Regions:
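Alpha/propeptide regions of enzymes that mature by internal proteolysis
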Residues: 1-73, 283
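Structural motif
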Residues: 2-5, 34-37, 67-71, 91-94, ...
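Active-site histidine-anchored catalytic micro-motif
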Residues: 3, 29, 33-35, 43, ...
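Short, basic/aromatic-enriched C-terminal tail that caps enzymatic domains
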Residues: 3, 272-286
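Short acidic, Gly/Ser-rich segments with clustered Asp/Glu that frequently serve as metal-coordination loops
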Residues: 10-15, 77, 179-182
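Anionic-ligand-binding alpha/beta catalytic cores of soluble enzymes and soluble regulatory domains
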Residues: 115-201
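A conserved acidic, glycine/proline-rich C-terminal tail/linker
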Residues: 185-273
Length: 286
C-alpha cells in the first residue's frame, strides 16, 4: 500500500477534499487506509509544476519515493474558448519516475514539465477524459486506487512519448510563500556572473523594481529587496527567490502606505502581489 499526495487547484476547498477522499476510500479494499496529504495549487499549471517538482525532489531526497503516489489536477481547460462537450478535459496519464515514485493525473498544460527529465515510463489511461465536471471525485479514484494498492498491472494503459509534455520556456513566478517571498523559475546559474551587491532589474506584470543580488536571502539589511538562490529547484542549480527581511520596528508610512512602511513590505507587495504563473522579465544594470 502506497501513500498519496494530492496537488490540485481544488485542494484548498474542504468539501472537495472530503468528496474526493470518500470516493477514493470507496474504491480501496476494506481496512486499507493510506495517508493522504493535500497541497493547494493556484489555478495555474505552472504553479502545479513548481509544487510537483518540489514535492518530488523532497520525497526523493528525504522520503520514500517508492512508497508514494502523487495525484495532480489543475486542468483549467484552457485549450479552447469554445463550448466543451461533456466537460471533457485533458487525458489522464501515469508517469513512473526513475526513483519509482508514481505521478498521475490530467496531462494539463505545464503540470509535468519540470519533472519531464525524471520520467522513466509514461502511460495514458483512456476513457475518463469526460463525463463529469468533478472528475477527481467521479472518474479518477478507481485508477488512483489501483496505483495505491500496487495493482497497476491490472490497468489497461498505453505507453506515451514524453514529447506529449511541453517544455516550460521563459521565467515565471513559481510560488509565493506565506512570508510574501516570490519563488521564481529562474535558475541561479542565470546570474552566476553577478557579484554580491550588484543591481538587477526585475519586471513582473507592469511593475519593475531594482533589486540587490546577494549570495543568500539574508545577505542585506532589513527592508532591502533582494534576489538570491532560494531553497527550491534542483540541488545543483536552485531557483532564484525575491525576498525582503521585514523590519518589525520600521516607522509607518503615509497615504497608501499608512500603517506600513516600505521597509515592512514583503517582496510580493513590492510587485503588487503577483500570482503564480505570472511571467518575469529580468535584465542586468551595468
Amino acid at each position: 500500500m502506497k501513500n498519496l499526495t494530492v496537488i490540485a487547484d481544488w485542494a484548498d476547498d474542504d468539501l472537495s477534499k472530503k468528496e474526493f477522499t470518500s470516493a477514493l476510500l470507496g474504491e480501496l479494499a476494506q481496512h486499507v487506509n493510506p495517508r493522504i496529504d493535500f497541497v493547494a495549487s493556484f489555478h495555474s499549471s505552472i504553479h502545479t509544476a513548481f509544487l510537483t517538482q518540489q514535492v518530488v525532489q523532497t520525497e526523493e531526497r528525504l522520503g520514500k519515493p517508492d512508497e508514494n503516489v502523487l495525484f495532480l489536477n489543475t486542468d483549467t481547460r484552457e485549450h479552447t474558448g469554445e463550448k466543451i462537450i461533456s466537460a471533457e478535459g485533458s487525458p489522464f496519464v501515469i508517469a513512473i519516475l526513475y526513483s519509482k515514485l508514481i505521478v498521475c493525473g490530467p496531462n494539463a498544460g505545464y503540470s509535468l514539465s519540470l519533472i519531464k527529465d525524471q520520467i522513466q515510463q509514461f502511460f495514458i489511461y483512456k476513457g475518463i477524459e469526460k463525463g463529469s465536471q468533478f472528475r477527481s471525485r467521479d472518474l479518477f479514484p478507481k485508477v488512483i486506487a489501483q496505483l495505491l494498492m500496487e495493482k497497476q498491472d491490472m490497468l489497461e494503459i498505453d505507453e506515451l512519448e514524453l514529447s506529449g509534455i511541453p517544455d516550460l520556456t521563459g521565467f515565471f513566478v513559481g510560488h509565493v510563500d506565506n512570508y510574501g517571498n516570490i519563488k521564481t523559475t529562474i535558475p541561479s546559474s542565470v546570474l552566476q556572473s553577478k557579484l554580491h551587491g550588484d543591481l538587477v532589474k526585475i519586471t513582473i506584470g507592469n511593475v519593475t523594481r531594482e533589486v540587490f543580488y546577494t549570495h543568500n536571502l539574508f545577505g542585506e539589511k532589513q527592508g532591502i529587496l533582494v534576489i538570491a538562490s532560494g531553497s527550491s529547484g534542483k540541488e545543483n542549480d536552485r531557483f532564484l527567490e525575491l525576498s525582503v527581511r521585514i523590519d518589525p520596528n520600521s516607522k509607518p508610512g503615509t497615504g497608501l502606505l499608512a500603517g506600513r512602511s516600505t521597509a515592512s513590505k514583503s517582496a510580493a507587495e513590492h510587485f503588487n502581489n503577483p500570482k503564480p504563473g505570472n511571467p518575469i522579465r529580468s535584465y542586468y544594470l551595468m
